[in-house]
Amino acid sequence: MTKSELVEKLAARFPQLLLRDADIAVKTILDAMSDALADGHRIEIRGFGSFGLNRRPPRVGRNPKSGEKVLVPEKRVPHFKAGKELRERVDRSLERQGDSSSEGEPVSLTAVKAARQAGGHHAAGFPAEATPTLVMSR
């Protein structure tokens, strides 16, 4: 869902709100959340989740062009942790859908390689309409 879609959904749910007013409300909320995170605060929305900051320590990187070592300074990056109610709601939704919807599900690199060797992702047990999504994380 994009910000524009969220604004439209808010305006549709509350007919007394003009689209412009819904847009202002969404922007105001997002600005307040951004400001809080920029100031180092944690945001908790019970039942939905929490936004916080993770620290990435300084490290030595490489300039890809020259190969020269470069010191990458410490960073603080925003992080979202889903709340229990949201996790359970998403899980229940996936259970209701069963195996019929695998779009966007993480697939291991091993499964993708095996599917290619076997003649495509259909041969590896993926539904014909689904294309495996490779998810890489640290």
UniProtKB/Swiss-Prot annotation:
Residues 81-138 are annotated as: Disordered. GO terms for cellular component: chromosome; cytosol. One of its GO terms (biological process) is DNA recombination. It comes from Ralstonia nicotianae (strain ATCC BAA-1114 / GMI1000). This is Integration host factor subunit beta. Belongs to the bacterial histone-like protein family. It comes from the Bacteria. GO terms for molecular function: DNA binding; structural constituent of chromatin. Heterodimer of an alpha and a beta chain. SMART domains: BHL (SM00411). HAMAP family: IHF_beta (MF_00381).
